[in-house]
Amino acid sequence: MKLQLIAVGTKMPKWVEEGYKEYSRRFPKDMPLELIEITAGKRGKNADIARILQKEGEAMLAAVPKGNRIVTLDIPGKPWNTEQLAEQLEVWKLDARDVSILIGGPEGLSPACKTAAEQSWSLSPLTLPHPLVRVVMAESLYRAWSITANHPYHRE
């Protein structure tokens, strides 16, 4: 099973790239973590936010390979603790499909992305900066994998 993060935004600070790479390289060959960056729409004083969300959503959904399970990262989604995320990984593995996790831009996800999703996950009730979310997601998914693999990374 492949895990795919599809995130709005490019040109992240170096610490984000390094943090993401540190965790993504740790994944086993049979469960690689891939990041696909979607160019954010131009936001200005008179920007049409609904149109920007629509365009970003179209680009995100176009990046999802056919047949993948789509999971959105959204504040109103279901909160999972680390053990619950590990359980989700096991469920996803049994489903025998790759998983695409959608991370929206500053205004969130388009209605089309939310409709296409089979699951919605709330990483936190806090609003987190999008660069930080990439690193937290990579670490959280790695930690969940470590639980399923009985790897000593996670300690209770």
UniProtKB/Swiss-Prot annotation:
The keyword S-adenosyl-L-methionine applies. It is found in: Cytoplasm. The keyword Methyltransferase applies. Its EC number is 2.1.1.177. S-adenosyl-L-methionine binds at L73, G104, L123, S124, P125, L126, T127, L128. GO terms for molecular function: rRNA (pseudouridine-N3-)-methyltransferase activity. InterPro entries: Alpha/beta_knot_MTases, RlmH-like, tRNA_m1G_MTases_N. It comes from the Bacteria. GO terms for cellular component: cytoplasm. It is an enzyme of class 2 (transferase). It catalyses: pseudouridine(1915) in 23S rRNA + S-adenosyl-L-methionine = N(3)-methylpseudouridine(1915) in 23S rRNA + S-adenosyl-L-homocysteine + H(+). Keywords: Cytoplasm, Methyltransferase, rRNA processing, S-adenosyl-L-methionine, Transferase. Transmembrane segments: none annotated. CDD domains: RlmH-like (cd18081). Specifically methylates the pseudouridine at position 1915 (m3Psi1915) in 23S rRNA. Homodimer. Belongs to the RNA methyltransferase RlmH family. This is Ribosomal RNA large subunit methyltransferase H. It comes from Aliivibrio salmonicida (strain LFI1238).
